[in-house]
Amino acid sequence: KIITSEQKLTTLLPLITRLVSESFGFYHTGIFLVNETKQFAVLQAANSEGGKIMLARGHKLEVGATGIVGYVAKFGTPRIALDVGLDAVYFNNPDLPNTRSEMALPLKVRDETIGVLDVQSERPGVFNDNNVKTLSILADQISIAIENARLFTQTQQALMEAQTLYRQNLQDSWLTFSRDETSIGYQ
């Protein structure tokens, strides 16, 4: 409920990573959003110390080419590494050295992958059917919340533009009216 009520992405995404990590006890939770060119999944929020370092340097992964997150961003299907040491797709991130298992879930809006929810644990084999199902439902809710926040921002921008145009039009009309008005009275 908290997630769907927040309207600003800059507040929403860090809130999500904190809540997910606290609720499930994950070592790291990150949210990546696919950029406009669909070339990179860009880290937008993270709760761990390593994640904060990655955020500071603008961490991004190439869609389809780098790690589990890149895989999920390209194919739009969940990916789980129960033991990252045995997963051929896993990207060994030096900022998250304690990761032993990882799950990445697509964030989708109308069948388009807009991002990835990435959760990591310090224990191997931690992911099971129950938390996969729960996190999949949560990923769907996160996707809706992200889309709502984006639509809210677009609506706010459109409203500001309309107000600016209205003020400009009103001012132009008033100036035109003032010039065209002839003086009435005694000479």
List the model feature ranges, each with a label:
Residues 130, 144-163:
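Short alpha-helical interdomain "coupling" segment at the junction between an upstream regulatory sensor module
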Residues 100-109:
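A short, aliphatic-rich beta-strand micro-motif
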Residues 136-143:
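Allosteric cytosolic regulatory segments
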Residues 17-21, 29-64, 84-86, 160-187:
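GAF sensory/regulatory domain recognition
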